[in-house]
Amino acid sequence: GSTATDVYAYYPTEEEGKAINVTASSGVYSVEVTVRDADTFDGKQIDYLYATPVQASKTSKIISLQLFHALTKVSFYIYKSANASDEILTLKKIDIRSNTGRLQIGKADMRLNGTGEELGRLNGLAGTSSIELTGSKILETSLTQPNISCLVAPMDAAEQVLSFRLTVDVDGVEREFETASISSESGVKWLAGYHYVYKIRIDK
């Protein structure tokens, strides 16, 4: 008939070979997503996308859907200082540290309809004070692009004390380096669809 119907879109439609299905409850449509509590330097976290619903009808069969990122991208330029140019420094771990537990992990329902900030919101995540990234990356003295990137959930509130603790192998001996807290009068609040970049220099 001529009745218009809402068309929803999300990505991916399956995870580890299992279909991701839409659930409906009291007019709210959502899909279940998982945000990892730890990841690798290669990045195993799935990039979840959603679209603003669009109406289709008998007289309006051609529609266009624009997808948006539900997660936040965080990238690092991690390099060694010139006075360590003769030594082999291998990055082994990045510990993203949130003093008041503003990092978000776990299973959530990604909302596919709603108004304003309701759309694309991840409901049901748990707060945590740490997310670890692990791998092996030999550090250079200069970089033209980030050498580590990850996807994390948006923060539900601002973090006043955000820092990074790095584990670095220095000529066979593991050492820890911790950055100062990222200073901002209003704190740090990672938002969905945004890309945050941090530069960290390792000195010996």
Model regions and ranges:
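Short, ordered, surface-exposed loop/turn motifs in non-cytosolic proteins
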Residues: 84-125
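Short, surface-exposed linear segments at secondary-structure transitions and domain or protein termini
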Residues: 115-121, 184-198
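Edge beta-strands of extracellular beta-sandwich domains
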Residues: 174-183
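Short, low-hydrophobicity acidic/polar segments
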Residues: 1-90, 95, 132-148, 160-170, ...
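Active-site/ligand-binding surface loops and adjacent short beta/alpha elements
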Residues: 116-142
